[in-house]
Amino acid sequence: MKVKTRFAPSPTGNLHIGSIRTALYSWLFARHHNGKFVLRIEDTDLVRSELISIDSIFNGLKWLGLNWDEGPYFQTKRLDRYKEVINVMLEKEDAYICVCSCQELEEIRKKQIEKGNKPRYPGTCRNLNIKNISNQNHVIRFKNPLFGKVKFQDKIRGEIVFDNAELDDLVIQRSNGMPTYNFCVVVDDMDMKITHVIRGEDHISNTPRQINILNSLKVKIPVYAHLSMILDEKGNKISKRKNAINIIEYYENGFLPEALLNYIIRLGWSYGDKEIFNLSEMKELFNLKSITKSSSTVNFKKLLWMNKYYINNSPLDYVSDCLKNYMEKKNINVEKGPDLELLVKLFRSRHHTLKEITESCRYFYEEINFFNHTVIEKYFTRKNCFILQTCYKKIEKLSIWDNKNISKIINDVSELIKVTKKEISMILRISMTGDICSPSISTVILLIGKEKALLRINNVVNYIKNL
């Protein structure tokens, strides 16, 4: 059997960590078995479907490298096919026309609730064999079996059983002519020859209905694996329309795709005590048996730790390329500063994300036009002005531009004017970076370059003089 999985999001909200976990597990399972991974957009909810959400799905999957082998298929482009299958089911009397009004159904529902019964369609039109409906509003319902049980072996949860008596006759076509979610899914899985359906546990209740429709169509039932929910840090279920972070925001916040995938795979799956998995290891080791039934909770600190690990342990040229792309997206001209590999070496052990690195090294690429009020009050003094003027003269005369000679200037100025190297380094740091924290100041000055370093010292000297 050729394995074929699918990721079938509805474009009605953000593509979030829960969605990506479903996509990742489906993708890995297909890759592990040398199968195919299908992308399908379930967009029949015309009211809530959004183009921006479709873009989010495509961009998120591409950024993470979860390439698809078939698709993207759009359900709204398959409406004729759904109608064709519905007509076959009507002819076989596996489906029927229902003319019950919304008002009638609501009255029935209220009475059932008053009696303490589960609300369900009573089958009013089931055996009426309605054919001539002219322009009368109607829906089409699937004729669900009245007796027996629906059993399926969930790859994560074991055997799950539903009683057909608990399932009512599902609407498969709405009064506006649009097919419903549960019906479209069945036809799509049938036509696309999906062998394994990996999805969230909120779909467990849909599964018996879908199996019954598949049985009526005489189609082989796929293997099901229902993933437990992912909770946010407050213990709430992540919902794409409420508390979910769009997956692209992780890119905006400077996360590496490998780090995010490694973090997400561990939200419900494990391989002993191993924490770090590269993509090849994920494809080799992933299996459905090791997925837990318990809910997983997002831990942002763990994600930051994971991202820092990848920034520090991925090849230098790769991290530099990622940083270059990130900085260019932030409209920073990387040609105006030092080689990015030098900056990655200098900064990656200090930070968790590309965003943090970018914010920490902007001064290499952009001029400093603002100084914090506290910095001005504490450090912009006549004494420090004199220190800077002395450093300026020494740096201006420096012929060999290297770290050793820049460090020597700081030592020489310290001895010459009897101030500590710490004081000299601090005012130089503020002049170069606009901040009181940075890597080694001699290294910073080296990377900024002689011309720009002299200009910045001169700017601060003039600033102090004009106070």
UniProtKB/Swiss-Prot annotation:
Q: List GO molecular-function terms, semicolon-separated.
A: ATP binding; glutamate-tRNA ligase activity; tRNA binding; zinc ion binding
EC class name: ligase
Which cellular component, as a GO term, is one annotated location? cytosol
Task: Quote the EC number.
Answer: 6.1.1.17
UniProt keywords (A-Z) are: Aminoacyl-tRNA synthetase, ATP-binding, Cytoplasm, Ligase, Nucleotide-binding, Protein biosynthesis
Binding positions for ATP per the UniProt entry: 240
Compartmental location: Cytoplasm
State the span of motif ('HIGH' region).
9-19
Q: Which PANTHER family match?
A: GLUTAMATE--TRNA LIGASE (PTHR43311), GLUTAMATE--TRNA LIGASE, MITOCHONDRIAL-RELATED (PTHR43311:SF2)
* Example GO biological process: glutamyl-tRNA aminoacylation
Q: Where does this protein chiefly localize?
A: cytoplasm
InterPro entries from the xrefs?
aa-tRNA-synth_I_cd-bd, aa-tRNA-synth_I_codon-bd_sub2, aa_tRNA-synth_I_cd-bd_sf, Glu-tRNA-ligase_bac/mito, Glu/Gln-tRNA-synth, Glu/Gln-tRNA-synth_Ib_cat-dom, GluQ/Sye, GluRS_core
Enumerate the SUPFAM superfamilies for this protein. Answer: An anticodon-binding domain of class I aminoacyl-tRNA synthetases, Nucleotidylyl transferase
Q: Residue ranges for motif 'KMSKS' region?
A: 237-241
Q: Does the keyword Cell inner membrane apply?
A: no
Which HAMAP family does this one have? Glu_tRNA_synth_type1
Q: How does it assemble?
A: Monomer.
Q: Which catalytic reaction applies to this protein? A: tRNA(Glu) + L-glutamate + ATP = L-glutamyl-tRNA(Glu) + AMP + diphosphate
Name it: Glutamate--tRNA ligase
Q: What does this protein do?
A: Catalyzes the attachment of glutamate to tRNA(Glu) in a two-step reaction: glutamate is first activated by ATP to form Glu-AMP and then transferred to the acceptor end of tRNA(Glu).
User: Key word Cytoplasm present in the record?
Assistant: yes
The similarity annotation says: Belongs to the class-I aminoacyl-tRNA synthetase family. Glutamate--tRNA ligase type 1 subfamily.
